[in-house]
Amino acid sequence: MASDLGSSLTSIDWLPQLTIQASIKGSQQNSVGRKGPGSPADPSAMLSKEEAAAHRDGKPPYSYANLIQYAINSAPAKRMTLSEIYRWICDNFPYYRSAGVGWKNSIRHNLSLNKCFRKVPRPRDDPGKGSYWMIDSCPKEDITLPRRKRPHPDDEVSQDSFEQEVNKSPLSSASEVSMPQEATQGHPMNNNSPLPTYSQANPTQMPPDSRAPTYNNNDCYKFSFSESTFPDLSCSFRSLYHSLLGKQGERGDKDLYNSMQSKQVLPPVHSEVQSSSCCMYQQNSGAAPSNLHPHNVPSISGLPPSHHQAQHQQPPYLPQQQMPRPPAPGMSLGLPSDWCSNIDSLKESFKIVSSLDWSSVDLSQFSDLMESLRQAELKNWSLDQDHIASLCDSLSHLLSTTGLLPQNHGQPPSCQAPCMPPTTSSACALRGGKPGHNMAVNSYGQNQPPPVSCGHTFTVSSGYPTQSQAPPTYSQQGRHPHRALYPPQRPTLRYPQSSDDIQDDFDWDSIA
């Protein structure tokens, strides 16, 4: 049993006999029969006839680099093409004639990767194909660059913190407050009207040696909120964004229907029909009592048809931007000029904008605000100083467009808008392109338009109920209602004809 274990492979009796000198001698004896795979030791070595005859029957004990060296040195010009090297190896060692094509790939790899072989282009006066290969007696050694030691992660953190402390200066902190130019270019304003100017009541004190900020004195970027207020502002903007999307979703198929109707070219409609489909809210804060008296408004029946049509006729297919409905009567419409620098005024603006009725408003008018909110949604509402400044600027554009923000400091918002005649392009679009749908009906069963009003108005969609009669106009002096006089004749209505509708020319009023 012991003899079996001693003769087995697990026996380690040979371990004490192993020495370094014996291993070196054994490796030298084994290396005599076959050359190493590296570069040849002697670039000018040649294969003798005796060695070629001794290894003619079997596989030669030479590496591919030695075979290439012997082939090139056998040529008189000390150069050979790849096909000539193949031919020389097959002629001197018949083993490679039936060895397949794998050895040829090894020859090509040695020529390309070994530095002692150099490729020489064929001269123009030398006919034939392929370049020549020669032996380079002094090959260029690759200069191995020293590898840079990778720093420890703790060292990287300490170095970054040190650089941040060095770069931290009053000049850099002042530049952080300003809005960069790339952020302002990413949110362009799609309006041709100039933005209202804002004055800063308490400007931020800057060091005397610092540079001037990148914003103008009239821009809305002159605010510096602490980072502790960023989560509250992000939540406010997020609730505003979701509120706008939710109220826009209530429109449903109305947007699609309105977009289809806006693309159709409708025929011109009578002036009395166009001027009769607008319901307005009138603000009497900045208007004089004489301007509100019904006697100062010219009667519609007293104007000639041509003059009346020239004043009020407007093609119904022209695009008309709709403003949102006004907030509740108890909500304050005025905001201070420095609202963007005060956190309380900014929160108040969120309440005012959220209280507006956006169900009938196309948000493409405020693409800058929606784009800023969409970018914030993509960032998961983790906003920085620059993004909040861009959102405040877009919100300022929204408030100034809707008239909630005064455009001039000395006048209220109600005095800013000029007195314009009412138009019904947006109202006709909401009714599907058929004018006269919301016209008032008098006691004789005839249609009559509502009274013409002037002042800062808000266009109301068709969701509000219409009165069966013309609403009375009140004056501030006596508070007595006065009904305007309208022509008793019925206006001629022309509807867009389609292939499915049948034109009805019968006068149904004659039966009544």
UniProtKB/Swiss-Prot annotation:
- In terms of domain of life, where is this protein from? Eukaryota
Gene Ontology BP, a term: regulation of transcription by RNA polymerase II
Composition bias type Polar residues, residue spans = 167-204, 456-478
Region Disordered: start and end of each range? 25-58, 143-213, 284-326, 448-512
**Record Pfam families:** Forkhead (PF00250)
- List the stretches of this chain annotated as a DNA-binding region: 59-150
Q: Give Gene Ontology CC terms.
A: nucleus
User: Where located?
Assistant: Nucleus
Biased-composition ranges for Low complexity? 304-323
**Signal peptide limits:** none
Q: Where is the composition biased (Basic and acidic residues)?
A: 48-58
Compositional bias annotation for Acidic residues: 501-512
Q: What is its main location?
A: nucleus
Molecular function terms, GO-annotated = DNA-binding transcription factor activity, RNA polymerase II-specific; RNA polymerase II cis-regulatory region sequence-specific DNA binding; sequence-specific DNA binding
Ordered alphabetically, the record's keywords are: Activator, DNA-binding, Nucleus, Transcription, Transcription regulation
* Annotated PANTHER family: FORKHEAD BOX PROTEIN J2, FORKHEAD BOX PROTEIN J2 FAMILY MEMBER
Q: What does this protein do?
A: Transcriptional activator.
What is the protein name given in its UniProt record?
Answer: Forkhead box protein J2
In its UniProt entry, the species of origin is given as: Xenopus laevis (African clawed frog)
Per the record, the gene is foxj2
